[in-house]
């Protein structure tokens, strides 16, 4: 039965490929890097005030995918290129389609990978304000990682944005163990994954406008509430 369910899921999802919008992919390329490792490569002696950790959607390229570069660009406009570090989740997070069918919407290895980035941010730059985000499987990954974090680190995450949240129904539009007022979930009308399905319909591929405007605006507002407007 489990094999049948997984096979059915993979067939349904594969029939809806590509899992990203070509226009969003083009915009991501035009904005520049779809891979960012500022936290991993950064020097603790020159920490940014803000660290953004983001998980891409299934099958997306780089570690920022299609939506991450837009958010990153807006954050850098607000805080300066030296004022914010951008870090995508790579490594053990393979963003494979099959992992969507796992109980938490992604793999245990992926959750450990993102947890490690939050922990590294806390160790390397203990005074930095953390923000986070994720799209599709990456939204489930961000939620699971934040849920599992030590409360002292979780409390440092000023805001989190989730697009096409595959665990939206199960988690009632929230991230467990994390304040609702620090969470912004973007679920388009007709995006079936937000209502408990794993079928990718057209609305699931249309979060570009949110990544360019409301999502980074929310994160910027939350950071400034913690650090001030400077």
Curated annotation (Swiss-Prot):
Residues 1-16 form the signal peptide. GO terms for biological process: carbohydrate catabolic process. Disulfide bonds join 47-125, 187-194. It is an enzyme of class 3 (hydrolase). GO terms for cellular component: extracellular region. Keywords: Disulfide bond, Hydrolase, Secreted, Serine esterase, Signal, Virulence. It is found in: Secreted. SUPFAM superfamilies: alpha/beta-Hydrolases. Pfam families: Cutinase. It comes from the Eukaryota. Its EC number is 3.1.1.74. GO terms for molecular function: cutinase activity. PANTHER family: CUTINASE 1-RELATED, CUTINASE 2-RELATED. This is Cutinase. It comes from Fusarium solani subsp. cucurbitae (Neocosmosporum cucurbitae).
């Amino acid at each position: 039965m489990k094999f049948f369910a997984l096979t059915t899921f993979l067939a349904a999802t594969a029939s809806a490929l590509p899992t990203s919008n070509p226009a969003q992919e083009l915009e991501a390329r035009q904005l520049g890097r779809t891979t960012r490792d500022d936290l991993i490569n950064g020097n603790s002696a020159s920490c940014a005030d803000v660290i953004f950790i983001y998980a891409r959607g299934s099958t997306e390229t780089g570690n920022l995918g299609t939506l991450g570069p837009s958010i990153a660009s807006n954050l850098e406009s607000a805080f300066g290129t030296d004022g914010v570090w951008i870090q995508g989740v790579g490594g053990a997070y393979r963003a494979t389609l099959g992992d969507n069918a796992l109980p938490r919407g992604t793999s245990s290895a992926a959750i450990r990978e993102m947890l490690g980035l939050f922990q590294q941010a806390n160790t390397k730059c203990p005074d930095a304000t953390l923000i986070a985000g994720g799209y599709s499987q990456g939204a489930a990954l961000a939620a699971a990682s934040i849920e599992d974090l030590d409360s002292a680190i979780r409390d440092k995450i000023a805001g989190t944005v989730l697009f096409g949240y595959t665990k939206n129904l199960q988690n009632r539009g929230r991230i467990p163990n994390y304040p609702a007022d620090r969470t912004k979930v973007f679920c388009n009308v007709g995006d079936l994954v937000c209502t408990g399905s794993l079928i990718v319909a057209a609305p699931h591929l249309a979060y570009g406008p949110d990544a360019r405007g409301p999502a980074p605006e929310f994160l910027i507002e939350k950071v400034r509430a913690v650090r001030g407007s400077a």
